[in-house]
Regions:
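Catalytic-core regions of core metabolic enzymes
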Residues: 1-411
Length: 411
């Protein structure tokens, strides 16, 4: 795509103005944060809170309905109950709003009645040409412009190269942790919910071509878009050097049943086949939520760094972990590096006489009997200079976290 701004998702991430239907000034209500986040994060466009009774919300003029807003908002977030959502969607369509986010749950994920309501809304969206995220969704987030549609208080966002696609609010309880404690560097985030209109293929088609996206994290409970197009986009991302980390739930029969009750997802196909296909198109599958976020963060931080080869050194404090990591190296198709005789000679002075250095390195006893800083700096410098070493897995004890950055920049 030559001009990413022409993609229909672009204005979801860069809305010129926002209507927040269901916004509240009550700090104990989740919808309070719809307005407060935009103000704290510095969103620069007009904000139009919509509330049937309140005249003002956090110092901003409120409107009893979207029809009373003087302008036509670029994006509307409908954060009300399931029963109110269809009527307010109709109000947005009549107002001429072209992009909506439907926050409420209680549609296809609850069974036949909810599915019927969702299908009726989908028909009205298609007939009007409006594009919709959700229902059962809460997004988007774009740190570059201070945009955060969330029920959690966000004081700051760190912008970076990681873009995230979710099928549910899996990320929502972790938002403050991701941005504050885990220090996640985010480019864009979209929660697709029940995927009544926009789906994972739409999101990928935008982010794969987004020049600010360097890594993509994708959470799926089902695939609603064209499966071949989905795989083509994953392969295209790999060809562009954009890693895609996939967390797909519903792998077991029980998980598939839970997914259906959560977002109304139909989990298709054999999971082992899905696993192999992901490998063929160059995507990376995460086995757990923690691994998903760890992989996303690591790939974003080390973007542009490529291994010269597959020879790995392991150095840990307990020897047991070194054994576990040695197994993992083999499982991932890597090899244990053959450390040169010269490197081993440089390391001998910092190792006890009875503990000869070898890969994998067990540093527990060594650091007890020597200066831990000297041991670690000597190890890093020696391994970095060894032409037979392409990468190292180093376990860094807490007492060394204050070392200068130059120590860790030797590789």
């Amino acid at each position: 795509m030559e001009n990413i701004a022409e993609h229909f998702l672009h204005r979801f991430f860069y809305p010129a103005s926002i209507a927040l239907i269901g916004a509240s000034e009550n700090v104990f209500r989740p919808s309070y944060h719809l307005v407060s986040n935009l103000l704290k994060l510095g969103y620069a466009g007009p904000i139009y809170p919509v509330h049937p009774k309140q005249k003002e919300i956090l110092g901003i003029k409120a409107y009893p309905d979207v029809g009373r807003i003087e302008a036509v908002p670029d994006l509307a977030v409908i954060a009300v109950s399931q029963a109110q959502t269809p009527g307010l969607l109709d109000d947005c369509i009549r107002k001429g709003i072209r992009r909506v986010v439907l926050v409420a749950g209680g549609f296809s994920e609850i069974g036949a009645d909810g599915r019927r309501l969702q299908e009726e809304m989908a028909g009205r969206v298609r007939a009007s040409g409006v594009r919709a995220i959700g229902p059962n969704a809460l997004s988007p987030i774009n740190p570059h412009i201070g945009l955060a549609v969330s029920f959690h208080a966000l004081d700051r966002l760190h912008s970076g190269g990681l873009s995230l696609i979710f099928q549910s609010g899996l990320y929502e309880p972790r938002l403050r942790w991701l941005f504050h404690d885990a220090n996640l560097h985010l480019n864009k985030l979209i929660d697709l919910g029940n995927k009544m209109d926009l789906n994972e293929v739409d999101a990928l088609s935008y982010l794969v071509h987004d020049p600010l996206t360097r890594v993509i994290g994708l959470h799926l409970e089902s695939i609603e878009g064209d499966p071949l197009r989905f795989l083509d986009l994953l392969a295209e991302a790999a060809s562009l050097g954009k890693p895609v980390v996939v967390l797909k739930s519903g792998r077991t029969a029980a998980g598939a049943k839970a997914a259906a009750s959560h977002t109304g997802a139909l989990v298709q196909g054999n999971d082992r086949v899905f696993d192999r296909v992901l490998t063929q198109v160059g995507a990376i599958r995460a086995e757990s939520i923690d691994e998903f976020f760890d992989l996303c963060r690591a790939l974003e931080r080390f973007d542009g760094l490529a291994l010269a080869g597959n020879r790995v050194v392991i150095a840990t404090m307990p020897g047991g972990e070194a054994v576990v990591m040695t197994d993992r190296v083999q499982q991932e198709g890597l090899t244990m590096a053959r450390v040169s005789a010269g490197t081993l000679e440089r390391l001998r002075p910092v190792f006890p006489p009875w503990d000869m250095p070898a890969n994998p390195f067990d540093l527990g006893v060594t650091m007890q009997f020597g200066n831990p800083v000297t041991v670690f700096e000597t190890l890093v410098a020696s391994l970095a200079a060894d032409p037979g070493v392409d990468a190292a897995h180093l376990q860094i004890p807490d007492l060394l976290l204050g070392l200068p950055r130059e120590t860790f920049g030797m590789f």
